[in-house]
Curated annotation (Swiss-Prot):
An example Gene Ontology molecular-function term: 4 iron, 4 sulfur cluster binding
InterPro entries: Aldolase_TIM, Elp3/MiaA/NifB-like_rSAM, MoaA, MoaA_NifB_PqqE_Fe-S-bd_CS, MoaA_twitch, MoCo_biosynth_MoaA/MoaC, rSAM
Assembly and oligomerization: Monomer and homodimer.
Function: Catalyzes the cyclization of GTP to (8S)-3',8-cyclo-7,8-dihydroguanosine 5'-triphosphate.
Species per Swiss-Prot/TrEMBL record: Pseudomonas entomophila (strain L48)
Protein name per its UniProtKB record: GTP 3',8-cyclase
Amino acid sequence: MEKNPQALVDGFNRKVDYLRMSVTDRCDFRCVYCMAEDMQFLPRQQILSLEELYQVAERFVALGTRKIRLTGGEPLVRQGIVELCGRIAALPGLRELCLTSNGSQLGRLAQPLFDAGVSRLNISLDSLDPERFRALTRTGDLKQVIAGIDAARAAGFRRTKLNAVVLKGRNDDEIVDLVRFAIDRELDISFIEEMPLGVISEHERGESFCSSDDVRNRLAEHFTLVESAESSQGPARYWRLAEAPSTRVGFISPHSHNFCATCNRVRLTVEGRLLLCLGNEHSVDLKQVLRQHPGDSARLEKAIRDAMQLKPYRHHFEVGGEVQILRFMNMTGG
């Protein structure tokens, strides 16, 4: 491993070299596990400007961050997103600029994003049934999303991966079909355990929870799964399919197999809070530093370094019971 004297290290000697940045809390979908249907979004003055987002990215890269992922909300509804991607991708030392999307805007933006320097895309796809897709997203058009997926494939990204949040009784019967869809397009796919963020109304999380082990066991009835040591620097554990070597299946398991011991990431919310853990409220207000001391990169760097010592060893997600994290996923950075 290369040594960087500037590298960020937390209090448990974990190297932090991956930043997830939310560029907006807004989204053109209202997914049932992500936000309330009548979600009230932040006023413009409360969110970081594109320049402020860039300043944070620049300091993190100077401190050894090698991977940045832009998230939302839906990042592609933020005006100026392609230009922001171009500026961040050009930062010396950054190895990968990635982006997570619901796919709705990729038909028009996939190629510009690739040209700007985005190397990897994650695209959410929870169902292949148009009516069910609409029910899960409340507003989404499956045909439009599939067109976006195909546009991403044509653009030439280093890697395009599908993400599916599995909910028992709502879409768990589509697990095999989703993998076959990924195989047909030579894409990777990850199945994600639902995360207990925010108060939701459409289902009980304890009843809808579907573990990664359950998903994997069902897939093993149809495919030959071969465990892989490959990593994307994120939380997913990957398996190869003997029948389809071009497709990997990943499992993101915050409940059943938490990945806290090797956590290498922090999150920036669009309102400038640096979250040290997805499942805790530990945070540092970087917006205050940016606005009270504009252009002071040394002060911003110190705030980032000091924040690392607040990073807890692990989260304490619970499947059932009272919700402990009240912020919704779109406010966190999905």
